[in-house]
């Protein structure tokens, strides 16, 4: 379940039944991400895949909603429908609050100390979009010096996401 609003991609994600997460990212994030990897053809993908596809950038986690304490099969259809309606109502309110605090997707920069993106890729993409290339290069060099590498790695070239970002920054 996702929506594009005011330059942001918002999505409700769940990997199990205990929690549902409201996530957001600027719509430009995946476009820039794919430019860095020379994968411009991905820009033609459906919006749903652009937002949460296998090679899209992680969104910022805005909110966690408790969903089910037990297995979904133990709830009837009416109970599940009510629970989802409640989540949707809460998410709409939280999206509106987020947009009041961050009305311009072009200037949004997520918390760099988040726990949902160990590689800080959305953070770096938003900095790059805002012309803060030197800050990104310095931060990535510091992370690499500490031995941190990204989850995504191109085995053929031996490069990880940080290497691709550094290469793109050199231009």
Predicted regions and their residues:
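Intrinsically disordered, low-complexity regulatory regions enriched in serine/threonine/proline
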Residues: 4-171
């Amino acid at each position: 379940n996702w929506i594009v609003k005011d330059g942001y991609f918002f999505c409700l994600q769940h990997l199990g039944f205990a929690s549902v997460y409201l996530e957001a990212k600027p719509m430009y994030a995946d476009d820039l991400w794919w430019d860095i990897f020379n994968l411009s053809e991905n820009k033609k993908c459906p919006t749903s895949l652009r937002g949460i596809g296998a090679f899209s950038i992680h969104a910022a986690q805005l909110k966690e909603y408790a969903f089910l304490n037990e297995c979904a099969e133990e709830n009837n259809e009416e109970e599940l429908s009510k629970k989802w309606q409640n989540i949707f109502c809460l998410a709409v309110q939280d999206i509106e609050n987020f947009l009041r605090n961050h009305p311009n997707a072009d200037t949004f920069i997520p918390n760099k100390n988040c726990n949902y993106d160990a590689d800080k890729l959305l953070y770096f993409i938003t900095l790059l979009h805002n012309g803060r290339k030197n800050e990104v290069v310095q931060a990535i060099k510091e992370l690499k010096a500490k031995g941190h590498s990204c989850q995504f790695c191109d085995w053929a070239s031996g490069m990880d996401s940080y290497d691709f970002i550094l290469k793109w920054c050199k231009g």
